[in-house]
Amino acid sequence: MPTSIAARANLELIDQNYQRWQEDPASVDPSWSAFFEGFELGNLPQRNGAAATAAPRAGVRESSFQTRIDGLVYAYRTLGHTIARVNPLAEKRPENPSLTLRELGFSEKDLDLRVSSKFFADNEEMTLREMIARLQKIYADSIGAEFMHIQNTRMRNWVLHRLESRPDKHSTPRQVKIALLRALMEAESFEVFLHSRYVGQKRFSIQGAESLMVILDTILHKCPPAGVEEICMGMSHRGRLNVLANFLKKSLRVIFTEFSENYIPELVAGDGDVKYHLGYRTVRKLASGAEVEIRLSANPSHLEAVDPVVEGTARARQRIRGDTEHRRKVLPLLLHGDAAFAGQGIVAETLNMSQLHGYGTGGTVHVVVNNQIGFTTLPEDARSSMYATDIAKMIEVPIFHLNSDDPLACMQVSKLALDFRQEFGRDIVIDMYCYRRYGHNEGDEPAFTQPDLYAKIDRHPSVAQLYKRELLESGALTEDDAASLETEMDLRLEMALDNVKAIEKEKIDKQAKFKESTAVFQPEYKSSPVATAINEKTLKAIVDALTRVPDDFNIQPKIKRIIIEHRRKVFENGGPFEWHYAELLAFGSLLLEGTPVRLSGQDSARGTFSSRHAILYDAKSGAPYVPLMHLGEKQARICIYNSLLSEAAVLGFDYGYSLDYPSMLCLWEAQFGDFANGAQSIIDQFIVSAESKWQRPSGIVLLLPHGYEGQGPEHSSGRLERFLQLCAEDNIQVCNLTTSAQYFHILRRQMKRDFIKPLVIMTPKSLLRAEFASSSAKEFTSGKFEEILGSPEVGPADKMKRVILCSGKVYYDLINYRAEKKIDNAAIIRFEQLYPVHETKLKSMMKGFPKTTQLVWCQEEPQNMGAWTFIEPRLRKLFGREIAYAGRDASASPAVGSLALHKREQAALVADAFKV
């Protein structure tokens, strides 16, 4: 419930406004005026703690009554939604004791008194009875509005004015009313048709929520005059087929084909997905001649997981359309379920992004399809709040609760919602109360768990039937008109089905084409070498930018020494360039070639380990300076953002961005790799499988700090094993690099092939500044990325008795041990890229070793983690012999908590690699 002014304001602010009000009541906001009038009324003379018995002066009586009138208006604006008729299944209006005559300070005899309120713009005089009726019509009919919690006065007053000045819905032109009926009938007839023709098949029908189509159509037709050119949509399974058919106008023939038992999508690769998860792109041409592009994102069954993906896609589309300042041309439109909106934490994460510099999209229209049930769960078991939408109050946006049985109200609020978004660049929420006519899916029996509710639903006419009856009774529709519409709907569906049957008869053994979707086809993965080196001139240009600041920039002395002067010295000496220096060189070289870069993550601008410093800050003003934005006039743009403290939503956002902007290098960095599992659903359902399921490739790069250095179980593992377990069909690339030059080349390689794949890099911690892992300038101006590297051998290959295979920083422990112990019969091979495995290169490197050579896999991670369980069967199959293991024992926890114990384990596993 909204807080009072007193609860949310400080005493100094109250005092300032009170003094202004005493001088001129009109000089303060009406809500303050009502507060002060009530305050003075409460301070009338008292006697012995009771109200004074003497009658107050006439002026005081008038002031008291007027204060109550103004309080009445304020009460309805604040609490009217609590008694609004928004539930289509409710038999009577909800009650709120705070809105009774008695609680508001009136009695029955006051109802016919003439009153007015300066709270209303027209200040029109009317009876108290008429005023209450007016307030109920505005705030407690089919629309329940929550907006008084918004502290931005202009925003709050804008909503207030739009609500109180909106025209009577019944004055809507006849042709508009007929168009609304058509939308409702199309939605209903589609579901009824599927229900009768494809009995028992899951379709997750929209029945009971058909007014969603009114909301969508209203927003669509309002887009061109509002300046919106494109809609990026996300929604779950409920009603998705109907939205595809009747809003995005996907071919009915294709939809019906997907219901066929013989349907197999003709995929270039991959496995496909069920019909109610597929994405879609279309351009709707409206009667006005205007066109609006609509993109519906493919989504998994993980409810709300698609939300940040859509936001990222929308931001990318805004960049493509050149709308990065105001962000009004591309509209994110998210459809939610009530149980999921309240229950899934990623909703709050996504809402929290809405006004952040690196993640804002100019406001999102949220539509909650509130069928008042989650599978079998009722609202009282699904949330602790009054409304499913209460979580949205944290970002202070308007929330409109709607009765889906009132399509005219749905239309009015939809127009208001888009106008609000365009005016303020903020989110807005439509909470459409409806019901679910059948079970969670069409094979489920809801009466098992909600018998009373479903008895009521069975008796309840559809919104199309109710609205048709209303139009017939008002004379806006004739019986012939209604019959003609019904015939038109049925004929359209029957013709599409007949077409499908004819095609199936002709091509019974052929695969149907996978088309009319968001699919993007690309060449297969290949390990061909890619030219990634840069020339010395380019290297110098980047270093010059990285070691230069404006004359008026007050650089912090320590930053000047450890960053600017250090970087210049490294360059002049020809190296060694440490890890993040190499990264900035890769970024800079791509920018000079016209490839933009986006990096986001927690503390990514400086780097968790204070080693990146991609953004410098003025020591006096705090103003940021990005050296890589000063390479040259024709360079591309680099965007580096410190993210909110979220993994799932931020990774989802950056993944969505990468989908629609493949020509940009998009990177997401976890603060520690251990935290990446906070985004596991984004990784599992989107990043590793989207190309197989939906033909949606992505080139996103995940940077996951990983390495065993005695920092305990929460700061050691990027969960390498989980990513390797997800590898198949060349779906992703997984790397564990050992030199800064390798990092440089792989980042450049990511943008220089004719295909894209997600890239997961286990980035180092202790190697970030280590000289032995740093590279010379020559390694950037020549060479390329190497999937597998050897080590300087200590003798002829045919004299080797042992080959130790490894990946990551344990390599350095192994070569140090070998040198220290003067071992001359053990070779070491390191996998820089663990997947896809470059088998040809590995075989070539192993050719010179005797067949009797002992093969050992060495890793820092426990035996049930790291690469062992992934790589061992592949090596055994490749070489036809057993592979010995050297590493930590299997463990439930990634690492020990004791530094001393860690060191003991590390020393033992390194020694074992030369003994097992």
Residue ranges and their predicted role:
Residues M1-F39:
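Subset of Sec-pathway N-terminal targeting signals
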Residues I5-R8, V60, R203-E210, E293-E304, ...:
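Alpha-helix capping and helix-loop boundary segments enriched in small/acidic/polar residues
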Residues G42-S211, V228:
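Extended, charge-enriched "interface" segments that sit outside catalytic cores
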Residues T67-Y74, H81-R114, E188, S251, ...:
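Flexible, glycine-rich loop/tail regions that form catalytic "lids" or insertion modules at the edges
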Residues D168-F190, E261-G322, P627, D754-N816, ...:
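Active-site cores of enzymes that catalyze phosphoryl transfer or operate on phosphate-rich substrates
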Residues S189, F193-R253, R567, E578-P596:
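Active-site pocket-lining segments that scaffold enzyme catalytic pockets across diverse folds
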Residues E229-E396, F400, F609-Y661:
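Cofactor-binding active-site loop characterized by glycine-rich and histidine/acidic residues
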Residues G374-S385, K393-V429, Y433-G439, A447:
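Conserved phosphate-handling catalytic cores of large alpha/beta enzymes
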